């Protein structure tokens, strides 16, 4: 059995710690049987589980995702329409124009976006997300995105998502009319920790954009980065902040410290803490697409990535990210085949 092989190197505890007594049994009833996410206090207990119980946690999280999301894995590619030169000060991001990072501003043309969408579709992906490093779109960016979506949809059989910052109601309506079916705008971290990560705009402005997106009928995609110095209590708060959005998708990133940013010297999150977070987020969000995004290669490696895919994750970004290198697309597809996880677009094991 694959899951036994993957988790076999970690012993399963024979006794349970008093302060987390029966939290996984509670989750089995509340989440697995009833489809109800854990609350903040319960998520915190999961995040505090002893290392020896991580295999048990991930096995339960995998059962939850199979029951409430199905066995298929959603594959997505992302592309940057506008890279660098962002006026915001997100402390983790090398695309900010306020930091001395090696990233320089650049735009991709429509032909380049269409070609990238074609290559992404060939992998079996169902999602192609166009991203821009901006606080919010100006008219030039809106017009170019509308043109790009039309061009892609006319030539490529793939769903187009977008991530271009804080929106007005008029911009939300235009994206919906253009055919954008899912919109990504990450909350990034817990509301209480956000001022430690971003000071040039508010957590509430991000939340308001997501409210408008959902009310317009687009799918809501919002996640963030684990391991930016937040406490376990704030990590639990973040999971429940996201659950309140009723999102279609939550991308899980892990901090990959970027040169020149305020977080450049932060330590990489411990693998066991990353696995706890994956399991906990699945138990908080039982019916949501939970996607591996940036930082998994550094934080989890190959084995941890496999554990995550058998521990609650049911979607991946293939290829490179916005400013960091991912794994070659073929490696991820081979891994899904090894684990006998079917890709959604192909509807068959790879």
Swiss-Prot record:
Keyword Isomerase: no
Gene Ontology process terms (BP): biotin biosynthetic process
GO molecular function: 2 iron, 2 sulfur cluster binding; 4 iron, 4 sulfur cluster binding; biotin synthase activity; iron ion binding
Enzyme class: transferase
SUPFAM superfamilies xrefs: Radical SAM enzymes
Cofactor(s) required, per the database record: [4Fe-4S] cluster; [2Fe-2S] cluster
Binding positions for [2Fe-2S] cluster per the UniProt entry: 129, 221, 291
Residues annotated as domain Radical SAM core: 71-296
Annotated binding of [4Fe-4S] cluster, by residue: 86, 90, 93
Cofactor info, note text: Binds 1 [4Fe-4S] cluster. The cluster is coordinated with 3 cysteines and an exchangeable S-adenosyl-L-methionine.
InterPro entries in alphabetical order: Aldolase_TIM, BATS_dom, Biotin_synth/BioAB, Biotin_synthase, Elp3/MiaA/NifB-like_rSAM, rSAM
Keywords tagged on the record: 2Fe-2S, 4Fe-4S, Biotin biosynthesis, Iron, Iron-sulfur, Metal-binding, S-adenosyl-L-methionine, Transferase
Pathway(s) where this gene product acts: Cofactor biosynthesis; biotin biosynthesis; biotin from 7,8-diaminononanoate: step 2/2
Catalytic activity, as annotated: (4R,5S)-dethiobiotin + (sulfur carrier)-SH + 2 reduced [2Fe-2S]-[ferredoxin] + 2 S-adenosyl-L-methionine = (sulfur carrier)-H + biotin + 2 5'-deoxyadenosine + 2 L-methionine + 2 oxidized [2Fe-2S]-[ferredoxin]
Enzyme Commission numbers on file: 2.8.1.6
Role noted for this protein: Catalyzes the conversion of dethiobiotin (DTB) to biotin by the insertion of a sulfur atom into dethiobiotin via a radical-based mechanism.
Family per record: Belongs to the radical SAM superfamily. Biotin synthase family.
Subunit architecture: Homodimer.
The protein's name: Biotin synthase 1
